[in-house]
Amino acid sequence: MEKDLIIGAFSNYNYDAVKPWIDSINQSNFEGDKVLITINVSTETNRKIHDAGFTVIPKISNGKMMFHMERFYHLYNFLKHKKHEYRYVVTTDVRDVIFQKSPSDWLSKNLKEHKLVASSEAIKIENETWNRENIIKCFGKDLYNDIKKYEVLCVGIIAGECEAVCDLTAMLFQLSSNRADWVADQAAYNVLLRMYPYNNLTKIAMLENAWAMNAHVTNRESQYNEFGPYLLEERPFFEDGLVKDVKTKVPFTIVHQYDRVRDWKNFYEQKFQVKINSQYTPDINPNVFTYRTDV
């Protein structure tokens, strides 16, 4: 039986920052290989990752671009030697992602004739300010106009057949380099996957498919009024320790951006016995009065 792989990459984090990602994978019954590429990370952190059952690959940053984009260089250089070793590959952001189930189960049942799966953020590009402006800035208005009616796809969760994921990471690195915006990977991902042949190779997973959810658009309370009128599906909900799709009541395989919801963050802090620091849900001192509405 072919093996599957979950692989991540991060820079400048300590172990606590990635512990929820690591622990959730270990608790998901995933039976494949687990790899973390680490940059500017202490020996102690690398040791703890190794002790948790992950292969650790320390790398040195080239220091010329944001890690959002640089990670794809390291992912490609690892995967290009493994194209025939793995069946499915899943690569995600590390700091704000947890797995609720083994991704192998969903992929084996749902990928079918497709080579890749991309997770929808349940909103059209033209209705989400950051993605709209980011795509225009990086790729111009003509390409933006070509894809603006499509839903936003999240580059923080990439999965599919090994060769397809490998070559996609190479394309994302090249398309993200030397762009006008300092974060260009999401724009590159949304442009690329709407073009041939990627548009034929990629399954777009909606919330009702229970593959992955991205909480920043759907569930961040401070932006309910901004995004609410434009959501293409109902907001996911939290029940019995799991984030679920409203329509099907099925738990998602992957939860992304859980730190945008204070109650979810608090739950995962207790579950994984770690302090989760987030700019989106900072600690609130009850003795300090604030007019801020984004906490």
Regions picked out by a protein language model, each given a short descriptive name:
Residues 1-6, 263, 270-295:
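Juxtamembrane luminal stem/stalk of type II transmembrane Golgi/ER carbohydrate-processing enzymes
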Residues 147-267:
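Catalytic core and acceptor-binding pocket of nucleotide-sugar-dependent glycosyltransferases
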Residues 28, 32-35, 112, 188-190, ...:
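Preference for well-ordered, secondary-structure-rich cores of eukaryotic proteins
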Residues 1-87, 163, 291-295:
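N-terminal anchoring/stem segment of glycosyltransferases
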Residues 12-16, 97, 262:
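Short acidic, S/G/P-rich loop/turn micro-motifs used as interaction or catalytic elements
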Residues 19-22, 48-50, 61, 103-105, ...:
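Short coil/turn segments at secondary-structure boundaries
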Residues 133-149:
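Short, flexible, basic/aromatic active-site loop/helix in glycosyltransferases
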Residues 74-131, 166:
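GT-A fold catalytic core of metal-dependent nucleotide-sugar glycosyltransferases
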